[in-house]
């Protein structure tokens, strides 16, 4: 497998990172190394490519950005660990379904290994749940065998804006975060822990 470079982008506007993902993906070559971007966003709602406006109940003046990822509307904000996967899935011998499974399983493994939390998936509702409350949302896009976008893990944040929407298109979906279980939850640690689990799974699948 080729090297995967990690980039810690810190706190960045969603639109800037989205544009950078598009630029990276459109200009990469078969020799371009894969990258994983670690980032935190100021408050923003993002709509998936099939997102329905009625799932935004009241934006409360939080910006809304249309994207080309899968899924419906979600919220990003400070204290949420976001990880983006800029991968050549053909080179890594991954299909779209296998990539989604790997992204989800890495989160389940991370929560179990480092926090002794038993997380699960729900058929037909992508994401990671603890006691049927959603702790992580994912949305990916694959273009010409290259992936971008990724997963957002609620870590230590204000969850209130999730009540302004139907998260991922589900009315009344309850959200949770790592800080509900560990008050000192830290997004930098979560990003590193998650990435380690993801890379391990990716290496084992090739």
Swiss-Prot record:
Its EC number is 2.3.1.181. InterPro entries: aa-tRNA-synth_II/BPL/LPL, BPL_LPL_catalytic, Octanoyltransferase, Octanoyltransferase_CS. It holds the Pfam family LplA-B_cat. The record marks 134 as: Lowers pKa of active site Cys. Its main location: cytoplasm. It catalyses: octanoyl-[ACP] + L-lysyl-[protein] = N(6)-octanoyl-L-lysyl-[protein] + holo-[ACP] + H(+). This is Octanoyltransferase. The lineage of its organism: Bacteria, Pseudomonadati, Pseudomonadota, Gammaproteobacteria, Thiotrichales. The gene is lipB.
């Amino acid at each position: 497998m080729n090297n995967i470079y990690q980039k810690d982008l810190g706190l960045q506007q969603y639109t800037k990172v989205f544009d950078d993902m598009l630029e990276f993906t459109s200009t990469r070559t078969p020799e371009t190394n894969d990258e994983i971007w670690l980032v935190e966003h100021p408050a923003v709602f993002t709509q998936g490519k099939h997102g329905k406006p009625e799932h935004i109940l009241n934006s409360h003046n939080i910006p809304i950005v249309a994207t080309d990822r899968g899924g419906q509307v979600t919220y990003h904000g400070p204290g949420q660990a976001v990880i983006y996967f800029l991968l050549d899935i053909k080179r890594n011998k991954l299909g779209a379904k296998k990539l989604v499974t790997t992204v989800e399983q890495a989160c389940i493994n991370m929560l179990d290994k480092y926090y002794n939390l038993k997380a699960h998936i729900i058929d037909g509702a992508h994401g990671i749940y603890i006691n049927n409350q959603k702790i992580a949302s994912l949305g990916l896009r694959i273009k010409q065998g290259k992936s971008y976008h990724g997963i957002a893990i609620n870590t230590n944040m204000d969850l209130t804006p999730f009540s302004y929407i139907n998260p991922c298109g589900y009315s009344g979906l309850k959200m949770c975060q790592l800080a509900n279980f560990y008050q000192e939850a830290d997004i930098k640690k979560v990003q590193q822990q998650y990435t380690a689990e993801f890379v391990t799974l990716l290496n084992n699948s090739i």
